[in-house]
Structure formats: structure tokens, C-alpha cells
Amino acid sequence: MIQQESRLRVADNTGAREILCIRVLGGSGRRYASIGDVIVATVKDAIPGAGVKKGDVVKAVVVRTAKEKRRPDGSYIRFDENAAVIIKDGGDPRGTRIFGPVGRELRDKRFMKIISLAPEVL
């Protein structure tokens, strides 16, 4: 469950290490984001000389949340951390690698490129 001011780890190789959620996209009253939701964020920590710099405003899709997510079959999925992947306006990832597992909900939201790059889909 991601909301404004939530900090997330970046799970790709764009050079950003940590981002801070500015806005959850999807309507004016939308308060929380879960796996597969798109957020607007700012880069809080980045590797020097990388593609993104500290202070850049980016779009990202949430790939892992510490808050459990209920699946249609009644099972629950949760991760140890909150993590996101920085994306372009078209929905494709800006990086070329994804680190760590991602949720199966990304397939339902049509983020196929992220699914194909991920080492594990849970």
C-alpha cells in the first residue's frame, strides 16, 4: 500500500536507488497504490553518472509491496520491501534489467516487458 511520501526501492538498473511517491495516478481521490499501479515519483538517491539524477520527476510502476495483496483465488502475496520500476510514458521500462521478483498482477495490467525482464514472477 503506497501513498504520498512513501519511499520505494528501485528494482532496475536506471541508476536510481530510492524514489519518493509524489502522486498515485488514477483519479483525483486515489489514495493508495498496490502492485501494478503507476505512480509519479521523485528520485531521492541515485548513482553518480547514471541515466536519472537526484531530483528528477519520473513515472514508476509498483512491483513489490510489504502490504499483502489478496488474489482472486483467495491467496495472499506480500514481499519484504516496497519496490518500483521506472517507466517511460509508453509503459516500457527505462532500464534494461529488473532485480528481484515481481508480482503476477503486472501481467493483468499489461506490463509485459517488465514481466519478460524479471528473473521471477510470483
Swiss-Prot record:
It comes from the Bacteria. Coiled coil: none annotated. CDD domains: Ribosomal_uL14. It comes from Salinispora tropica (strain ATCC BAA-916 / DSM 44818 / JCM 13857 / NBRC 105044 / CNB-440). The gene is rplN. InterPro entries: Ribosomal_uL14 (IPR000218), Ribosomal_uL14_bac-type (IPR005745), Ribosomal_uL14_CS (IPR019972), Ribosomal_uL14_sf (IPR036853). Binds to 23S rRNA. Forms part of two intersubunit bridges in the 70S ribosome. SMART domains: Ribosomal_L14. GO terms for biological process: translation. Part of the 50S ribosomal subunit. Forms a cluster with proteins L3 and L19. In the 70S ribosome, L14 and L19 interact and together make contacts with the 16S rRNA in bridges B5 and B8. One of its GO terms (cellular component) is cytosolic large ribosomal subunit. This is Large ribosomal subunit protein uL14. Transmembrane segments: none annotated. One of its GO terms (molecular function) is large ribosomal subunit rRNA binding. Belongs to the universal ribosomal protein uL14 family. Keywords: Ribonucleoprotein, Ribosomal protein, RNA-binding, rRNA-binding.
